[in-house]
Amino acid sequence: MAGSTPSSVPDVLAPGLTCIFCGINPGRVSAAAAAHFANPRNDFWRLLHDAGFTPRLYDPQEQFSLLELGLGVTNAAYRTTPGSGDLRRGDFDQAEFEARIRAAAPRAVAFVGKEAYRGLFNERPELGAQRRSIGRTGLFVLPSTSPANAAVPYQERLRWFTELRLWLEPVERQAVRGLVLDREGQVLLVRFEHPISGDAWWATVGGGIDPGETDEDALRRELREEAGLADFEIGPVVHTREATFPWAGQLIHQHERFHLIRVETHEVTPTIDLVPEGVTDVRWWSPAELTAQSEEVVPEDLLQIIRANDA
């Protein structure tokens, strides 16, 4: 993926990076050098080192060495201008940018300056972690490192770079989920929808384990709240999964255990308002319906798991 860009400054990208830094667009100095943040008065590379992202101070021409550290660099707009104020609204392509990020699937994107974020999403962000995400990629906004932002003290900008480095370490979370199958072989799933991006996906019933809870405690609570289901036996663990994803401005590393639960039949009747949890629907699915529908299903191998346990 590295270098595949319509700009004179190549993207520094690879699949599965920890963080991609996103500037607003190439300035003339960067375009001439074919390197990101190449203006010697730009503090990006110094801040990257002082915040602990790089073991030493890198030169802009060493930008592809960032990939070895799990880091990348791109721009919100590709057109070179004397300054970011010379950009037009049409220089930003949100759909193309999101496709670029989904293809790379990093843990996070850090926008170097509010204007890079604003140009893409037409929103005025605060500095720090954002509630918006792109798929399973979290978003973070840093102060600009441009010499035009020199009025913001270096130590203040360094504080935000350091906060980003700490934020990139996800919060560990234990979770339990139910592979709930009825006598017809249907599976009970909940539909999540991100409140800002609109990304939607279906997942098995379940959730995080609260302090002091056992798997059974948490699973009974979740099934009662999400489906009104109370009369059931909890079976063995039939699948485990680990996933890192953004939620409500945090990065979560979730350890999930899936218990097999068989029921005769059940009419779904949630006992709480699920909208604040991001849940928009709870329903039974047949394997044929799951195969035919187009929205994302988590875990990706759910059909295989169902078939392996549909005795």
Residue ranges and their predicted role:
Residues 131-132, 209-233, 241-297:
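Unchanged
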Residues 68-123:
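Internal catalytic-core helix/loop-beta-alpha segment
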Residues 1-18, 39-40, 47, 83-98, ...:
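C-terminal capping/extension of enzyme domains
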Residues 17, 27-32, 197-199:
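Short N-terminal binding/cap micro-motifs at the start of the first secondary-structure element
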